[in-house]
């Protein structure tokens, strides 16, 4: 009872007129109904708390889920910019299905079958194994293409949001971009990301781009770190009052 429970919520989307307040409030009521103190944290910020620990919590965190992608620009543990876009893994599946005439369920199955696809190989290379049918080849090429489109969409919006933000801190050193979520776990993802990333057009110098370790659970671990920090601060506050 009265322990801290941190739960993640998406940041406000920039490409769709919708809010997340209702869902946040529903989650809060459920959690508090079990006797916990509910504390929300934005999804990409939670990812940053796990993936940017070795860089003084400074850098860019991108959480790529099925329905949305969340982005946070962090400086010394503080969020300088957060937003989301309403595209993710489902968007890839839907567009590949529309272009190839294959069902969305089958596209998802092919995309998540590690032995079938490697995005690190170019479209003109053999990204599929021997015995792959023509239909499956078309699906695999379309998956790679739409991964590139999604990543480009993320980077373009990040650049626009960064340049339009007020009071953005100066970053004295090159920063990492860390990525988490199920949509980034396909083999060869980083290769496609690097193809779309253009340092000359990006607003700050980037020293590395990597997928966070244990990507599926990274956000949960970030939520736990935030909960422990809140409890520690509350304990210190109580000790100060007693003195």
What does each model-identified segment do?
Residues 1-61, 76-83, 89, 94-149, ...:
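Nucleotide/phosphate-binding catalytic cleft detector across ATP-hydrolyzing
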Residues 46, 66-67:
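Short, glycine/acidic-enriched loop or turn micro-motifs at the edges of active sites
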Residues 69-73:
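Short beta-strand scaffold segments in enzyme catalytic cores
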